[in-house]
């Protein structure tokens, strides 16, 4: 059971956030092994630092911010693994109807992929994303707009 402070234990943390963090990292990194590493490092940082949060939303935002930073670090490093194929995505439980969108999303530049995933997949507002990424809300709105345009081109030009 979690402590009275509302802080999650390791098992509860994985149950509560593990799947969402993995999806997020998988879209960012396009590689299951790297995504697993990023999630593990994110959760380990949480356990090591024992941060206190005012709300579950603040805790979730902190975890996604740390995960985004881990993903960026991984993307900066030399590629260790090839990108996921559509067959590998299907093997990881993605529905066939989602594969085209996931593939298109994974082909976008990182800054658009990150904004679109945080907003549309994880449900963060533009203000929350701006705070997480150290950008202005208007910059995030522009990234979302441009990202949607690029995603549309990626989906419809690929047919």
Task: List each model region and its residues.
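Arg/Lys-rich amphipathic alpha helix in sigma70-family domain 2
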Residues: 48, 54, 64-84, 146
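Internal acidic/polar
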Residues: 73, 80-105, 125
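DNA-recognition helix of helix-turn-helix
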Residues: 68, 72, 133-158
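A short, charge-rich alpha-helical start-of-domain segment used by transcription regulators
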Residues: 1-23, 36
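Structural recognition of an alpha-helix C-terminal capping motif at a helix-to-coil junction
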Residues: 23, 37-44, 57-69
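A short pre-motif secondary-structure segment
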Residues: 115-119
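C-terminal flanking helix
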Residues: 22, 43, 109, 113, ...
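Sigma70-family region 2
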Residues: 2-4, 30, 41-58, 77-79, ...
